[in-house]
């Protein structure tokens, strides 16, 4: 499938409805060719998930999906590519999802995984990027390096691209992003750093790679956080890619930019 075909597939498969309906829709969206072959479910730190690849120091991929959908099944393709590029095992935990399990359930499950694996490298995309940043800020000693792709970092209203890019982002818009965030984090004030990591103390973060695209809703969430992290002395690598939709890396076989950012993540974690 090429880029045009992928964009048609995204338009034809909106992720909407109840949490159960969104989970099924996102899984169809993630795998245009049908359900993938998956490794068996394993458990790390009491959290189920799947390992992709084998080798040395583990990598934990905290998946996106607004804390409502997504999992080790939806993120099989990028996890496999990252495992191949690094020659290392990638564990994608199936942390508890909202609305059934709002915050702090996903944080607690992810923290148990990091504790069990003894300072792994961590990757997170979208809500998983938010999760990675919250853990990196509160428990920096429990990860070695961190890479986040289009993370949610701000509910306080500082971002302008949440509205400006809602018409140019095939995969996300501000209304949907807020709906998902309210389901998972709505009981937290918008200025709580657990809801808005942008407002927290970034000074203790491990070496950090951040990436986003110019036309996605969460561009400013990335740029504003990157600027704050840089000011606090964090070792930072920032990549901004032109003219792509949110979660472009989910289809590395269809987007050269998807594989390229996974190569950048692999280099950062080397």
What are these regions (language model features)?
Residues 13, 44-50, 54-270:
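Alpha/beta-hydrolase superfamily serine-hydrolase fold, recognizing
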């Amino acid at each position: 499938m090429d880029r045009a075909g992928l964009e048609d597939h995204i338009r034809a498969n909106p992720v909407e409805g109840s949490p159960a309906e969104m989970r099924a829709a996102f899984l169809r969206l993630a795998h245009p060719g049908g359900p993938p072959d998956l490794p068996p479910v394993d458990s790390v730190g009491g959290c189920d998930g799947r390992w992709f690849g084998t080798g040395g120091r583990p990598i934990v991929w905290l998946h996106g999906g607004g804390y409502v959908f997504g999992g080790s099944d939806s993120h099989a393709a990028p996890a496999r590519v990252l495992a191949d590029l690094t020659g290392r095992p990638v564990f994608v935990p199936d942390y508890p999802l909202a609305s059934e399990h709002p915050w702090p359930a996903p944080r607690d499950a992810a923290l148990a995984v990091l504790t069990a694996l003894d300072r792994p490298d961590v990757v997170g995309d979208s809500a998983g990027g938010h999760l990675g940043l919250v853990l990196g800020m509160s428990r920096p000693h429990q990860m070695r390096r961190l890479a986040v792709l289009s993370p949610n970092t701000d509910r306080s209203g500082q971002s302008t691209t949440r509205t400006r890019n809602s018409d140019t982002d095939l995969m996300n818009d501000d209304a949907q992003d807020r709906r998902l965030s309210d389901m998972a984090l709505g009981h937290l004030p918008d200025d709580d750093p657990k809801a808005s990591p942008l407002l927290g103390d970034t000074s203790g973060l491990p070496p950090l790679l951040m990436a986003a695209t110019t036309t996605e809703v969460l561009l400013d969430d990335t740029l504003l956080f990157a600027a704050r992290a840089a000011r606090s002395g964090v070792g930072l690598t920032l990549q901004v890619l032109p003219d792509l939709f949110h979660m472009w890396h989910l289809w590395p076989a269809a987007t050269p930019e998807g594989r390229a950012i996974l190569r950048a993540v692999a280099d950062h974690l080397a």
